[in-house]
Amino acid sequence: MSNQNSKKHLGHTARKRFGQNFLHDMNVIHNIVSAINPKNGQFLFEIGPGLGALTEPVAEQVDKLTVVELDRDLAERLRHHPFLNHKLTIIEQDALRFNFREYFESLELKEGEGVRVFGNLPYNISTPLMFHLFKFHDLIQDMHFMLQKEVVKRLCAAPNSKAYGRLTIMAQYYCQVVPVLEVPPTAFKPAPKVDSAVVRLMPHKVLPHPVKDVYWLNRVTTQAFNQRRKTLRNALSTLFSPEQLEALNIDLNARAENLSIADYARLANWLYDNPPAVDNQEEIIDEDI
């Protein structure tokens, strides 16, 4: 089989720049839809419907579904779908730049209601897209995403592990994180070079460790995990003196992965009250988020 044919599915050639890998294993699809458990009357929103592997079985169970798709060819296919088109609201836009708050608020959600978001996310944008969605956690009931297996491990990680990092802390700050199922490369066309997994993210109704400004939580976790091999005495030296860390009950010889979310929230709130005179925001290194 030619390389071009191996990337083609249902007449559409996967586009590398969009990170497209199309799900086609019916058992996996069934298990994902069962995990989502869509119900009529719920507000369902799919990111990256692609060729409709999840769109079709979800839409069969509900009267309406909103999807956001960047690929104009795929959006056009959905507009002309033989039995879904009347159920779909299709937004042809980049999900990373989409104003979810404006759209979700336009739905006039009742108290206690939230949007149910799901999707087989392009792996090249999955982490920044989740960070984008966390901003709208108060309007979301839950999220079910297909991700790279290693990313799911990081989302679910506990302190004192290699997988524990900035992504862990920010995800668990906003959400309860539950792994759902693992998915082999053979479930996709073209097959990715990595294993995949599905995760459920359920935003907390009340944040367990609230911070006064999430900027400082981002700030302190970025600096700590960008230098995760250093002790916190050294990694956070531009933000805290050793005496200040000790006063906040932080072990000076601990490293970034040793602190809990509650510890980082305490550091963030102290920085909010005592911001450094000069705040040289460090560049975020993808491998540590």
Curated annotation (Swiss-Prot):
InterPro entries tied to this protein: KsgA/Erm (IPR001737), rRNA_Ade_diMease-like_C (IPR023165), rRNA_Ade_Mease_Trfase_CS (IPR020596), rRNA_Ade_methylase_Trfase_N (IPR020598), rRNA_adenine_dimethylase (IPR011530), SAM-dependent_MTases_sf (IPR029063)
Give the residues the record marks as binding S-adenosyl-L-methionine.
Answer: N21, L23, G48, E69, D94, N120
Please give the GO cellular component terms listed in this UniProt entry: cytosol
One Pfam family cited in the UniProt record for this chain: RrnaAD
Its domain of life reads: Bacteria
Q: Provide this UniProt record's keywords sorted from A to Z.
A: Cytoplasm, Methyltransferase, RNA-binding, rRNA processing, S-adenosyl-L-methionine, Transferase
Enumerate the catalysed reactions.
Answer: adenosine(1518)/adenosine(1519) in 16S rRNA + 4 S-adenosyl-L-methionine = N(6)-dimethyladenosine(1518)/N(6)-dimethyladenosine(1519) in 16S rRNA + 4 S-adenosyl-L-homocysteine + 4 H(+)
Which cell locations does it reside in?
Cytoplasm
GO molecular-function terms, A-Z:
16S rRNA (adenine(1518)-N(6)/adenine(1519)-N(6))-dimethyltransferase activity; RNA binding
Record flagged with keyword ATP-binding? no
Known EC number: 2.1.1.182
Briefly, what is this protein's role?
Specifically dimethylates two adjacent adenosines (A1518 and A1519) in the loop of a conserved hairpin near the 3'-end of 16S rRNA in the 30S particle. May play a critical role in biogenesis of 30S subunits.
What family is reported? Belongs to the class I-like SAM-binding methyltransferase superfamily. rRNA adenine N(6)-methyltransferase family. RsmA subfamily.
Q: What is this protein called?
A: Ribosomal RNA small subunit methyltransferase A
The species is Actinobacillus pleuropneumoniae serotype 3 (strain JL03)
